[in-house]
Amino acid sequence: MTSTPSFRPPLRLWPGIVLAVLLVCFQLAIPVLGPAGPPLRFLGGLVGGLLILLWWLFFSRTPWSERIGAIALMAVAMLVTSRFLHISIADAGQGPLFPILAIPAASVALVAWAVATAGLSERLRRASLIATILVACSAWILLRTGGITGDGRVELHWRWTPSPEDRLLQLAAKPGTPAAAPTKSDAPAPASEPTAPVDRPAVDSRAETPATRNPASAATPKEPHVTLAEWPGFRGPARDGVVRGVRIATEWETSPPVQMWRRPVGPGWSSIAVHGDRLYTQEQRGGDEVVASYSLRKGDPIWQHRDAARFWEPTGGAGPRGTPTLSNGRVYTFGATGILNALDARTGAVVWSRNPVTDTGAEDPGWGFTSSPLVVNDIVIVAASGRLAAYDAVTGERRWIGPEGGAGYSSPHLMTIDGVPQVLLMRGARTTSVSPADGTLLWEHRWAPSASIVQPALASNGDILIVAGDAMSGLGMRRITVRRGAGAWTIEERWTSRGLKPFYNDFVVHKGHAFGFDGSILACIDLADGSRKWKGGRYGHGQMVLLPEQDLLLVVSEEGEIALVNATPDRFTEVARFKAIEGKTWNHPVLVGDVLLVRNGEEMAAFRLSRAAH
């Protein structure tokens, strides 16, 4: 009787190869999917990885010991690895980042192993299988993230490399480095009363010793002298991203922008406010949330105000999200943890400080508090997530709290509709309007659940343009007509369009058209009916301002490039482009006269633009 060797069918590799190729191609194609790209990148990667594991377990024809052993080893390796991850991967507040990254990577590595070792002996195959799984799962210990791009790509760096913030702190700690000796608060202000600015002196950073400190007055705040800032805050004087009265030369090949200065700054997505030779912004410096003033001409630091607070989340990283607001000689700022400050614009001295989060009972919305303060007459208004809070601009006394509503990340927006001044806020599934005098609800329009990030805008006839949607739905834009009736406000929907679907990138309105980002691509729609006129130009998830006298968009890309694009409906035309700053750039650009200011979470720079010949 002769024994016959056991027959082992060949491995069925083609399904695994197909799934792995599709997974990789899907990840590469994400940028063309628009606003839905970021969540689909994570969801698609996870689903693709799990499908590969199902192939391996039930259809690969490998020995059952290898199938089950590989899955078990992968689970154990990921569990052990999770204990040693960098916090930026381990503490992904918006979701389980590590398995979302590790499962697709380990699954593709498994397919690559199966293909590469098909002709090896059983002993070598199993040894290399163990090594492949351990490396694919444990390699994440060596990495950290620098956040996530607008299309959902995780920015990976070696764990031991310093972040831009680390390098900035190391630079500031060097002897002889000029830096402002800051004012400082050890805790957020209580909700009951404004804090007295007694022990929080402002310091001129150009001084060489602490002896030059300018202490804040403990006296009752006085009404400041009325002045108008050139760029008083978020998206300009009207919060519409429009630069009026400025014409620039567009032949950048012959007259390129000239760099005035460049300097490192702390992380944060704050934009810049400008008055005279002073600019103001917010940034994170280690454990302190900082309001900083710099020279517009030279970029030198003038003063810093510090609060002992730090906000961080894995998508956008650390730092404040809101932009300072300038009004009557004061700087109003709202930090990512919810601290509202009124500072003297000249010295940085604290006038008063409040905590609207405590006052409203708002919960952390996840990506931090992002509102930029709005000053209307004698009150300053902020949005603590989806609820408005108003304070006396001089004393900090609480004036009113707005109606409750869904969470959101937009800022209060002043509009005059049918002759009535009102403050609009995008929040959750609704757009609400309140009276700036007392916070009384005037009207409300419901649409669909939304991340509520983008600011509303006015059409030429007074209609309102609003945006709804999130990274998955990308619902688009809607035009509504709001009128004051005999006893109530009436709201009529004119159209809803998917031709322009901004997610967190604000749009501008010009000559009957809206221009903005549809995902990572610029688009133009006709405001008469919402139809798309063109779509073109890939700038990532950037921002823009409009120069209406020249029919021109000044676009800052997510990669820190500046581009000039014609704001005309006939076709997409890029006029010029240059690289301005390094790093992921989500901050709004500022153009004051012929000075262009751009910043991100790593650096800030100023450029002189040539004036156009009239």
Task: Show the residue positions of the predicted features.
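Membrane-embedded alpha-helical segments of integral membrane proteins
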Residues: 24-118
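Blade-level signature of beta-propeller repeat domains, shared across WD40, Kelch, NHL, RCC1
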Residues: 560, 584-614
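Extracytoplasmic beta-rich repeat domains
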Residues: 254-256, 260-275, 288, 304-325, ...
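Hydrophobic alpha-helical transmembrane segments in integral membrane proteins
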Residues: 138-169
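Internal/C-terminal transmembrane anchor helices
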Residues: 122-147
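Aromatic (tryptophan-biased) beta-strands that constitute blades/sheets of beta-rich domains
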Residues: 159-196, 200, 205, 211-264, ...
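Structural motif
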Residues: 288-291, 433, 472-481, 521-523, ...
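Loop/turn-rich, solvent-exposed surfaces of beta-rich toroidal or solenoidal domains
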Residues: 472, 497-567
